[in-house]
Amino acid sequence: MENRWQVMIVWQVDRMRINTWKSLVKYHMHISKKANRWYYRHHYESRHPKISSEVHIPLGDAELVVTTYWGLLTGERDWHLGQGVSIEWRLKRYRTQVEPDLADQLIHIYYFDCFSESAVRKAILGHRVSPRCECQAGHNKVGSLQYLALTALVAPRRPKPPVPSVKKLVEDRWNKPQKTRGHRGSQTMNGH
């Protein structure tokens, strides 16, 4: 019988970013308790040798699984040292891969306080509204003028530590042009 291959999207991520993601997840699971229904699965609990960890995030009947890998083939850049992340949405026996933006939106629907579009209606009706959104990564569009006015009224406060964002985890920060720092006029630092 011939080999059957299954292809899946794995986002190449550097090791330090994966470690930051894991520590943020553990913080919000155990200390802030905002993600206390999440399940962190260690590498020794998996039978697959390339899986570094899994984070199972319940979303109603479904769940989102963020899997980190190690020991993969290196990428085209020197810093792609065989680390990667895949994001999967599961409902019973159905599984599909999702993009980081959608994963953040799904997480934001179920977890972390939000000052959302519904806050405009609640404020007009005189109801108490949540003063801020803890998960800005879950919003991908500009709000209405009323929403922007309400958010301007309430000063945003950044949660410490920040909410774990899947989009931030797989963000490609290496291909952005970086400025070198050094002494003024240094020939070696200016690239001349």
From Swiss-Prot:
Q: BC-box-like motif: where is this motif?
A: 144-153
Give a GO cellular-component term: virion component
Q: Where is this region: Membrane association?
A: 171-172
Which segments does the entry list as coiled coil?
A: none
In terms of one coarse class, where is the protein primarily found?
host cell
Q: Which residues form the signal peptide?
A: none
Segments of this protein annotated with the region SOCS box-like: 151-180
Residues bearing Phosphoserine are S144, S165
Q: Which residues carry this modification: Phosphothreonine?
A: T96, T188
- Can you say where in the cell this protein is located? Host cytoplasm; Host cell membrane; Virion
Q: Name one Pfam family in it.
A: Vif
HCCH motif, short sequence motif: residues = 108-139
Where in this protein does the record put region Interaction with host APOBEC3G?
A: 40-44
Q: Where is this region: Interaction with host APOBEC3F and APOBEC3G?
A: 54-72
Which residues bind Zn(2+) per the record?
H108, C114, C133, H139
Q: Where is this region: Multimerization?
A: 151-164
Q: Where is this region: RNA-binding?
A: 75-114
Q: Does the keyword Membrane apply?
A: yes
The disulfide bonds in this chain are none
Q: What else is known?
A: Vif-defective viruses show catastrophic failure in reverse transcription due to APOBEC-induced mutations that initiate a DNA base repair pathway and compromise the structural integrity of the ssDNA. In the absence of Vif, the virion is morphologically abnormal. HIV-1 lineages are divided in three main groups, M (for Major), O (for Outlier), and N (for New, or Non-M, Non-O). The vast majority of strains found worldwide belong to the group M. Group O seems to be endemic to and largely confined to Cameroon and neighboring countries in West Central Africa, where these viruses represent a small minority of HIV-1 strains. The group N is represented by a limited number of isolates from Cameroonian persons. The group M is further subdivided in 9 clades or subtypes (A to D, F to H, J and K).
Query: Could you give the subunit structure recorded for this chain?
Result: Homomultimer; in vitro and presumably in vivo. Interacts with viral RNA and Pr55Gag precursor; these interactions mediate Vif incorporation into the virion. Interacts with the viral reverse transcriptase. Forms cullin-5-RING E3 ubiquitin-protein ligase complex (ECS complex) by interacting with host CUL5, RBX2, elongin BC complex (ELOB and ELOC) and CBFB/CBF-beta. Within the ECS complex, Vif interacts directly with host CUL5, ELOC and APOBEC (APOBEC3F and APOBEC3G) substrates.
Please report the name of this protein according to its UniProt entry.
Answer: Virion infectivity factor
The taxonomy runs: Viruses, Riboviria, Pararnavirae, Artverviricota, Revtraviricetes
Coding gene? vif
